[in-house]
Amino acid sequence: MVEKDTWKLITATALFTVAVTTITDYAWTSWQAQKQVIAQQKNKNKGGQTKSDTDKYHQYDEQFIRQSLKNNVEFLGEDTIEKLSNQYVVVVGAGGVGSWVVNSLVRSGCRKIRVVDFDQVSLSSLNRHSCAILNDVGTPKVECLRRHMREIAPWCEIDPINELWTLQNGERLTLGNGTPDFIVDCIDNIDTKVDLLEFAYNHGIKVISSMGASAKSDPTKLNVGDLATTEEDPLARVVRRKLKKRGILSGIPVVFSAEKPDPKKAKLLPLPDEEYERGKVDELSALKDFRVRILPVLGTMPSLFGLTITTWILSNISDKPLEPVEGKNRIKVYDGIYQSLAGQMSRVGIPSQRIPLALKDVSYLVEEVFKGKSPISGISTRLTLTKWDPSKPISLQNVVVLTKNEQKVHEDRVLKGKESLQDVYDAKVLKLVSQRFREEAYYSQFR
């Protein structure tokens, strides 16, 4: 009985100690914050802030800053947060994606960021910018970010560069304040984007690039992977092709969406007829070679791209690196599915027939057309391909994704047994398969 009471006393003492420590920590932090707010208010009352950002940084001691990053410290560890505080990141492009990168980097503990962008905050960009408000419209995007980030973490050094990044001034704009640990590409002009990626690659600087967020709306299709493995991203395809011409085949990590572009969702925004009638349409763009018409952007998507980029950076410098599936490029899986169709052809007595499908068509059929699951059972494991209608040749509109067991039944009853599709499958399955084939016929126009 005495031993039991002793353990109760020890437990109660431990809980009391934890509670007192937590309360003391909270009280100290609150007192520090209140003291600093009062000091700032007094400074304003004297006629505005006269101290430089460097001096202002010293108003906040390290323990106070660490408390503001408490959750990140607990998750990533003290060493990673310390390392992050010493990272120098250059973000090129301060729009929908870039502003979220800067915002989340600052909130995560990065203390030295250079932001390069020539553009101004527009009214139409407020739906996707990380911090811009109505009063910021018409002001440089980089200055907008600096002002708002100062309110969040005044100890962070934001270096705003209100210029267009070009290959000619790349050395100055990228390396002028020292060699960065990371370059983040959030540019939406293709040629400038390619130049920046080549610059980072040739200088051996870690880089991550945002691909196209326009006309995308499915967050479940967001991926991180090498540029060489992207799918269903027209911007990535063009950038990849241009970099190949410059001898860069891989080694550029990107954030991209594998969602198939669908004109039914979003189309290139038209230019008003009156602008065409005035002539010299190219002069309407902000700069030579920059876009005049644009694809519409769902406001939530750029933020996902930006936050993913920051998460990649955090993971890269920690002991918790990302292990992404390279988009949907599960080559071995798709090759196995492809071989399942070749094996079926041998089993039904036509081994010499060349399958008119490429390996890339397999990922397209599995992921895009049949949504990664069998139309019969809805199961998404042990998938194969099977010829559907025995009276028609194999094509993208006569191949169905089935499980291995379903493939065997289909072979025995339809392909070998000569039973009709209507006798083997109910109307619901037949309707769904027909719907998938119609969707493929539509999608194939844009492949």
Swiss-Prot record:
Subcellular location: Mitochondrion outer membrane
UniProt-recorded Gene Ontology molecular function terms: ATP binding; tRNA threonylcarbamoyladenosine dehydratase; ubiquitin-like modifier activating enzyme activity
The organism's place on the tree of life at top rank: Eukaryota
Membrane-topology annotation of the record: Multi-pass membrane protein
Enzyme Commission numbers on file: 6.1.-.-
Keywords, sorted A to Z: ATP-binding, Ligase, Membrane, Mitochondrion, Mitochondrion outer membrane, Nucleotide-binding, Transmembrane, Transmembrane helix
Effect of disrupting the coding gene: Displays only the t(6)A but not the ct(6)A modification in tRNAs. Unable to sustain respiratory growth under non-fermenting conditions.
Biological process annotations from GO: cyclic threonylcarbamoyladenosine biosynthetic process
Transmembrane segment boundaries: 9-29, 86-106, 294-314
Pfam families: ThiF
Entry keyword Chloroplast: no
Single GO cellular component term: mitochondrial outer membrane
Family: Belongs to the HesA/MoeB/ThiF family.
Record's miscellaneous remark: Present with 1170 molecules/cell in log phase SD medium.
Protein task: Catalyzes the ATP-dependent dehydration of threonylcarbamoyladenosine at position 37 (t(6)A37) to form cyclic t(6)A37 (ct(6)A37) in tRNAs that read codons beginning with adenine.
Protein name stated in the entry: tRNA threonylcarbamoyladenosine dehydratase 2
